[in-house]
């Protein structure tokens, strides 16, 4: 009889423990990015082995879908949607209004009316289309709108620079960008079943994130939804993220505080484009060990914060990505698609 009681108690304790484990992970969603040319390849097979959360790279951006008047091209994102539906994946659409815009939009002769018309057309058709897709769970509405200085990201001369031409549309009576309000207005109205994300690059410069926090509250004050905020996490790509890596304890604390603020304000938190940049590969083995250590700190934090609200993590690409004139972006697999040291960290969050 005593044996039976002990056995029952053990079962109850074990069941409770198992449920706690399950509950602690159900708010933490982990995935990766694939490009169109990577579908039905070894890389996509590796993706399907571990993930069900996909970001379809840049296939949904304005520069591809609606680069200029009377020009539309849904072919790339349609193929990504087909892939997601075939494999029962959840998608975050990365087609935000921001710097990754067509040359036509960036041309200096563009008027504010022309920019607004293209924005309204693109956002309207995108929201109508993706709201009908059961695989689409999240959508980046705007991206890279604030500089690390805290100033609004705006236009530059020419059409071949990293710039944000949409600011030319103007500011409202409270000095807030009209294009941001219009983007969230359209998404709120036409994508009611998609979680709307305000995505942002750089590190944890206080002026930047203070402005983003005020922006979220201002957008909501107009009656529009903001359901989540995103931090890209392109580590060591620019000076704006050097501080996160060079003073990791402070960087993790800053990230922790931002996630807490998000959850306290009924926002999901997304790490949207995590990778690790190295300028050359002369010391790659050590660089990859550093990457693993930094990723471990980030992932452990995200796991812990998922107890308080939804947290997602997206690895930008699966393998090494080379950018001419820049260097090498490292992810969880090597150029040859062999697991990098960072891949080992997935054992604790995917199993």
Summary of predicted features, one role per range:
Residues 19-53, 57:
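Boundary/entry segment of secreted carbohydrate-active catalytic domains
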Residues 49-67, 76-203, 267, 276-281, ...:
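Substrate-binding cleft and catalytic face of glycoside hydrolase catalytic domains
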Residues 66, 108, 129, 140, ...:
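Aromatic-rich peripheral "rim/lid" segments of glycoside hydrolase catalytic domains that contact
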């Amino acid at each position: 009889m005593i044996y039976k009681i002990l056995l029952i108690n053990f079962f109850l304790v074990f069941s409770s423990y198992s449920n706690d484990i399950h509950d602690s992970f159900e708010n933490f969603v982990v995935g990766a990015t694939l490009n169109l040319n990577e579908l039905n390849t070894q890389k996509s097979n590796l993706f399907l082995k571990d993930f069900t959360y996909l970001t379809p790279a840049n296939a949904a951006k304005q520069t591809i879908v609606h680069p200029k008047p009377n020009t539309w091209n849904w072919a790339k994102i349609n193929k990504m949607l087909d892939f997601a539906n075939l494999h029962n994946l959840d998608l975050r659409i990365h087609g935000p209004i921001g710097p990754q815009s067509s040359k036509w939009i960036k041309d200096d002769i563009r008027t504010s009316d022309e920019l607004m018309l293209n924005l309204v057309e693109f956002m309207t058709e995108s929201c109508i289309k993706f709201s009908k897709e059961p695989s689409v769970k999240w959508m980046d509405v705007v991206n890279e709108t604030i500089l690390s200085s805290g100033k609004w990201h705006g236009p530059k001369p020419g059409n071949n620079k990293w710039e944000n031409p949409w600011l030319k549309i103007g500011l409202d009576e409270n000095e807030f960008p009209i294009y941001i309000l219009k983007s969230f207005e359209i998404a709120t109205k036409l994508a009611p079943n998609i979680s709307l994300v305000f995505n942002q690059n750089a590190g944890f410069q206080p002026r930047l994130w203070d402005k983003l926090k005020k922006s979220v509250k201002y957008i909501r004050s107009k009656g529009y939804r903001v359901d989540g905020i995103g931090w890209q996490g392109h580590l060591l790509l620019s000076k704006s993220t050097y501080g996160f890596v060079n003073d990791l304890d402070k960087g993790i604390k800053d990230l922790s505080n931002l996630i807490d603020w998000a959850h306290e304000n009924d926002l999901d938190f997304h790490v949207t484009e995590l990778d690790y940049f190295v300028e050359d590969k002369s010391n790659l083995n050590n660089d990859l060990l550093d990457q693993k250590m930094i990723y471990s700190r980030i992932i452990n934090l995200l796991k812990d914060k998922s107890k308080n609200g939804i947290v997602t993590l997206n690895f930008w690409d699966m393998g090494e990505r080379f950018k001419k004139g820049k260097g090498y972006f490292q992810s969880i697999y090597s150029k040859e698609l062999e697991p990098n040291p960072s891949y080992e960290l997935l054992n604790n969050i995917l199993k």
